[in-house]
Amino acid sequence: MELRRNIYQKLLEWKKEDSGQVLEVKGARQVGKTYILKKFGRENFRKMVYISMAERSGEDFLRCLSEASEWNPGEPRPRQPVRKALEMFDSEFTDDKETIVIIDEIQESSTVYNQIRTLAREFQCYVIVTGSYLGRLIEREFFLPAGDTEHIIMEPLTFDEFLDVFGERELYETIDLYGKNPAGDYEKLKEYYEIYQKIGGYPAVVVCYAQYKDVSRCYAKIEKLMSIFADESKRYFEDIIDKNLFEKLFNAIALLMIQEKQGVRDLTSELSKIAYQEESGRMTKKMINHAISWLQESHIIGYASKAVDCDYMQIKENSRYYFLDMGVSHYFLRGTGAPYDVIKGLLAENFVYLSLHRKLENTREIAGIVPWFASYEKINGELDFYVRSLLDYKNYGIEVKSTDAVAKTGKKLLEDGKLDYLYLLKGETKGGIADEKIFTIPLCLADRVTYRRTHGLD
């Protein structure tokens, strides 16, 4: 089964722009980076050179690079050893615009990663580098090539990509946000959302569901993916003394999502308490911080910051965690034993978080570096998400409800002038508009929302 991915269009735009920079494609393990890059290379270039630093081809290229770089004191230094290495690796390599070089799992070799500047400045061909654990690049032997790269993040399948598998993408893209379509159209998308929130968007999991229509099989796939991630991650840590560190942190993050609703001052300390029940001496705060940073750099988790009283000038960073895949979120939340209505509400928030996260990564539509939620000290309330638009410089509140619940905090913030508009993203609705200030939208259409006064599509 071939999955159509939104990133393909971005790759075409990068090729057309021809900036001369190396493209760094980031993303979690098993989101389909290798597949889509090979497809892009085959379909858009006369010649593709593919090297995986985690496979035999990587060993072969390192051998070529070593031989091309050989030098003895007193002799002239070798000229353009990287070019010579590519010519040795592939006799048909030519440095022109009809050629693309793809270096996969580049985090496995600092020697090759440190050639990015050369690849950007001395070559005419297109170059893409990628890897699942690029967080390793914070180690001292990796020299970050500032100014010579641009990046794209590839994530698990988004909801519209998921719908494409089942032939419903056109309905998603054209359905009215505020209820003008037949009720059956909204119900159909809602049914697919109910599946998506449980299994998420990892390609192997989606293909499994498409083939068997069995959610329990998908849970097994997710469990295997997370187990492989944990095992592979451990080899990058010299200071791990608890072999189950990542499994414990996953469970602790899920518990923390359930326990806290106002944001906490020190997420690391809270996670340590949950994961280790305050057993002294087993893990240092530094080690926990290292592991959490790794999970973020590996695109497994993300965080949200808190805006006090919906004030974009009062932002408290790192105040809440979310998983970066709905299936992973559901898997670990379900494992806590929490009631399903609690889990369903948290999944709804996670879904909207991912939508805002994408807008921050891909557009200049909203302010901040991560999504924000907000507190309202006056009534000791909380707003699920707060958006400061860079399109009309208005303040938008978002209340997320998996059912048809009332949004008291959001409405009070609107009444008190802290917000200009309020979006109610609900699981049980067809959508509607009230007083040109409050907009009710089906939860599954979160990615269709834009933050400007027209309240429509781009």
What are the functions of these language-model segments?
Residues 1-18:
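N-terminal pre-Walker A segment at the start of P-loop NTPase domains
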Residues 25:
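Hydrophobic anchor at the beta1->P-loop junction of P-loop NTPases
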Residues 33:
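Conserved lysine of the Walker
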Residues 36, 40:
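Hydrophobic positions on the alpha1 helix immediately C-terminal to the Walker A/P-loop
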Residues 121-142:
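Sensor-1/coupling segment of RecA-like P-loop NTPase cores
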Residues 127, 352, 356, 383-404:
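Conserved catalytic cores of phosphodiester-cleaving nucleases, focusing on short active-site segments
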Residues 142-259:
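Interdomain motor-coupling "hinge/lid" segment immediately C-terminal to the ATP-binding subdomain
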Residues 211-383, 389:
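Accessory nucleic acid-recognition modules appended to NTPase machines
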